[in-house]
Amino acid sequence: MTRVINLDGESLTLEDVIAIARQGVACRIDDSAVEAVNASRKIVDDIVSEKRVVYGVTTGFGSLCNVSISPEDTVQLQENLIRTHASGFGDPLPEDAVRAIMLIRINSLVKGYSGIRLSTIEKLLELLNKGVHPYIPEKGSLGASGDLAPLAHMVLPMLGLGKAYYKGELLSGQEALDKAGIDKISLAAKEGLALINGTTVLTAIGALATYDAIQLLKLSDLAGALSLEVHNGITSPFEENLHTIRPQSGQLATARNIRNLLEGSQNTTVATQSRVQDPYTLRCMPQIHGASKDSIAYVKSKVDIEINSVTDNPIICKDGHVISGGNFHGEPMAQPFDFLGIAISEIGNVSERRVERLVNSQLSKLPSFLVKYPGLNSGFMITQYACASLASENKVLAHPASVDSIPSCENQEDFVSMGTTAARKAFEILKNSRRIVATEIMAACQALDLKSENHELGKGTKVAYDLFRKEVNFIEHDKHIEIYDELNKASTVIEDPSFLEAVEQAVELSIQF
């Protein structure tokens, strides 16, 4: 039976977002939402017919909120809004981000506080389910008043305007609709505002980054465990007794993950008089990785709330009361997404330092740069350079976006969140850090193969090593390889969900204790 996810505005999960955005799972409006949507719409129709003054319905927008709009112009007002607010810039957002945006906007609208027609929500849903993906430039949002510019680009194809992708081809909005067998619509009063006023874009991008960060946290524990085995690391820093007296959840989870991954390993040791402690990047993995786990768990809790929230303005209450407020303001997510970027950056930072320990012959006691006959061969020399470059770039990107604000709209919107920038930066940091972790895993596997005594790996690390070696080659000499290709293979392996799933079938991994 084909899976379909019901959207009721209350129960959408991060896993649902991933299923719809990346796996193409279909969704539908839950029957329980229909009555509230229709009731909300009737209130808007009454406002127009009674010529009541309500922001964005019978007035202009932003600093033009005191300009009255006649009932006969309320429809044109909404189309004008979309045409002029679609002023983004830059490369188009990727397909999974666009699908997540469409999904989260639908889920917010079906709560019944936005005064939009059910048929208009269903039109956006039809585009999503039939794979018509609006062309949305990545830049141009202040994160307050919501994500106006990118969401206006989302709406354009619904009107037969703008551009959209359909089956991998970029088309005009009207042509995409025609090929998908979808009729365009005209907007009614308030509908343009309802579709574009909200934190949907920043939330969608941040939600995808959060999900990927959770997977990266587990991969970083795996990478660290493999590096520990290369160095015959001391296992006492991961004993449960040490961490129960400082019961930080992420720290406890990391220590347990490392213990699980290394169970049965013959490549670890205990402290001796000649070697009392390992360096921080190995010994303090529970404290370093764990701090990022706690940060990202907090961010996920905020995402879970936001994907089921109303971020429109004004809000149409069930009793007919209309409230002009500030739920569109992205600050509640801008700060968490800045935090997300910092947390992921630290994972990349510590992984790069472990890469250095692997390629440095004085630290690893292996051939320089993990290759036979160093000098003639450079091996992994420049992979560490690349990791250092990415780690340093992350440090720049990790500067918080939310501490900045530029007033807009004739100073009516005088303090903005920059939350969309925060989310986009977090995703870039994620991509950089994932490449660093992939490099660490590749270097650790190379180092294990170079060890003169190759003992049994741990229960979890052996599964990972065996899977990795099916795709990524041992580098014997520089002459016969292009290391860039092998690095790309390494990235592809760890990004494939089946890799981590296989490890987790062997051992339990978690981000919270």
Curated annotation (Swiss-Prot):
Q: What is this protein called?
A: Histidine ammonia-lyase
Family, according to the entry, reads as follows: Belongs to the PAL/histidase family.
> Which positions does the record annotate as the modified residue 2,3-didehydroalanine (Ser)?
145
Q: Which enzyme class?
A: lyase
At what sequence positions does the UniProt record place the cross-link 5-imidazolinone (Ala-Gly)?
A: 144-146
The record ties this protein, via SUPFAM superfamilies, to: L-aspartase-like
A Pfam family reported for this protein in Swiss-Prot or TrEMBL: Lyase_aromatic
Q: Where in the cell is it found?
A: Cytoplasm
> Which gene codes for it?
hutH
List the Gene Ontology MF annotations in alphabetical order: histidine ammonia-lyase activity
| Primary subcellular site in the record, as a coarse category | cytoplasm
Q: Which reaction does it catalyse?
A: L-histidine = trans-urocanate + NH4(+)
Name the EC number(s).
4.3.1.3
Q: Which GO terms describe its biological process?
A: L-histidine catabolic process to glutamate and formamide; L-histidine catabolic process to glutamate and formate
Supply the source organism for this entry. Answer: Streptococcus pyogenes serotype M49 (strain NZ131)
